[in-house]
Amino acid sequence: MRSGRQARGMHRRIRTEAGTSLIELMFAMAAGLVVLGATLQALSSFQQQFMRQQREVAQQQDLRIGLEVLEQELRLAGSGSLTTVALDSVGFSANLHGLSTTVTAAAAIGQTALSVEDGRGWEDRKTIVACWAERCETLALARDGQRHLLTIRQPLTGAIPSGAAVSILNHVRYYSRRDDQGVLRLLRQVDGGASVLVRDIQEVRFSYWDEMGQAVTQPAFVKRVVVEVMLSHQGIRTVREISLRT
């Protein structure tokens, strides 16, 4: 009898202990899941913050490089080369790649070919300018340049003497425009081909100043260009002042 009671008591203790252990295990698993969920949420938040910071850093880098290129090209163009002076855009003419050559034989009125020292690397449809004796003639190429020959679209209306300097004249424009989603961007256009410099900006503003520090709207009087760019979601305004070469 005693042995039976002892056995039944032992069985009850075993069941109780087993039940308690199972409950403890379930609580431990639940606590572990809560900790795991919190950890995953923290990791996700950290990842999103990291990616946002990376995008902001990349955007700032794009802006810095874009403004450096704008400054270099405006300085290369110099005073008197501006073609567009607007609040949201600036346009100018410049020989961006330094292509130049010299006429080796006089070209008469009506000719469409210029004999030059070296015409290689001069692309079809580019604008060129020939200068001599304080006079310049603007022309357009009909085809890619050859080793000693440049072919122009229209017959010459005036003679060009031997020794005249010839150079490429690129048409450059920096401007802001929204894409199909309404995101404002800063773009660079060279001879009709445009590329995006900086995406997701809040504002781009150009202003123009003469040698006396007065705001002007006539391209011929501009001696200094100021560009201001505000990046979206960052509250950062970047200002670049560019003095033009005279």
Predicted features along the sequence, with ranges:
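Short, exposed beta-strand "edge-strand" segments with a Pro/Gly-rich flavor and a Y/T-containing core
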Residues: 19, 82-83, 191-194
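Aliphatic-rich helix starts adjacent to a transmembrane/signal segment
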Residues: 2-5, 11-71, 75
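Residue-level preference for short coil/turn positions at secondary-structure junctions
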Residues: 18, 124, 220-223
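Short linear sequence signals and composition-biased patches located at protein termini or domain-edge surfaces
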Residues: 2-6, 45-48, 54-58, 71-77, ...
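Extracytoplasmic beta-strand-rich oligomerization domains located immediately C-terminal to a leader/signal peptide
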Residues: 42-189
